[in-house]
Design a protein with these regions (language model features):
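Conserved internal helical-beta-strand scaffold that buttresses enzyme catalytic cores
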Residues: 1-158, 168-188
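Hydrophobic positions on the alpha1 helix immediately C-terminal to the Walker A/P-loop
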Residues: 163
């Protein structure tokens, strides 16, 4: 990674992957350094981005330190024995290092690296939550007011998003309403 961003603009993105004030806030704060402007724009869209999220932490030392360096994508030997890319999460040090990609999950470090890998460690170590690659939805019976929450654990590219965004079938009429909570990663 050393020297790979020479001559490029480095961006500092302070972010929060949970609602401010939630019980999960201490595990959700991070700072991503990246040399990739589209990564910054996508992080702004995907997460809560502001310095205030770090300033409001009870223990400011707990934020995740994430570094993404795009690298020379054409010459990194992807898919060969000489592959120079690496994607590392050192969970007990709250550190993420990704080199050699501009692909979403490998560049938007708040998502898979922090939101899933780091959070799996944090949840287990704290005993306070579970982080999984789940979709979450709710089904409301408008007639009775009953609400059912459904959690589905599926691997990537298996239909979590399609299922999470489903509508009640026409055969059930207007009695049921489906609420979308999330389609990829859940902290429960």
């Amino acid at each position: 990674m050393r020297g790979q961003s020479r001559g490029k603009t480095m961006y500092v993105v302070p972010y929060l992957m949970a609602p401010p004030g939630s019980p999960l806030e201490p595990y959700a704060a991070g700072v991503e350094l990246t040399d990739n402007r589209p990564v910054v724009l996508h992080m702004i869209r995907m997460a809560r981005v502001a310095v205030a999220h770090l300033e409001n932490l009870e223990d400011p030392a707990t934020f995740v330190r994430a570094v993404h360096v795009t690298g020379d994508l054409e010459n990194l030997g992807q898919g060969t024995p000489e592959d120079q890319r690496y994607f590392v999460t050192v969970a007990d040090q709250r550190t993420i290092l990704h080199f050699g990609s501009s692909y979403g999950g490998n560049a938007l470090l708040g998502k898979i690296a922090h939101g899933l890998r780091q959070a799996c460690y944090d949840g287990r170590a704290s005993g306070r939550f579970l982080a999984e690659q789940f979709m979450l939805l709710g089904i409301v019976d408008k007639q009775t007011g009953a609400k059912y929450h459904i959690c589905g654990g599926f691997p990537s590219a298996s239909g979590k998003t399609n299922l999470a965004m489903t509508l009640a079938p026409d055969a059930l009429g207007v009695r049921y309403h489906v609420e979308f909570y999330g389609d990829d990663i859940a902290w429960i």
